[in-house]
Amino acid sequence: MNQGKIWTVVNPAVGLPLLLGSVAITALLVHLAVLTHTTWFPAFTQGGLKKAA
């Protein structure tokens, strides 16, 4: 492991949940930004434009 000595400074019982939690929060924030700041993504998730019959 390249950065293996980090666990001598930070306890893994604290560091791993912080790392995984920060990754999850970042992913949720990116998805929220895509949903709220684009027009194509909500249309894509709703199936696009409906064609007249």
UniProtKB/Swiss-Prot annotation:
The entry's keywords: Antenna complex, Bacteriochlorophyll, Cell inner membrane, Cell membrane, Chlorophyll, Chromophore, Light-harvesting polypeptide, Magnesium, Membrane, Metal-binding, Transmembrane, Transmembrane helix
Cell compartment(s), UniProt: Cell inner membrane
Statement: the UniProt record of this protein carries the keyword Isomerase: no
Regions of this protein lying in the Periplasmic compartment: 36-53
Residue ranges of the TM segments: 15-35
Classification via SUPFAM superfamilies: Light-harvesting complex subunits
Residues that hold a bacteriochlorophyll according to the record: H31
Name of the protein described by the UniProt record: Light-harvesting protein B-800/820 alpha chain
Organism: Rhodoblastus acidophilus
Lineage, uppermost ranks: Bacteria, Pseudomonadati, Pseudomonadota, Alphaproteobacteria, Hyphomicrobiales
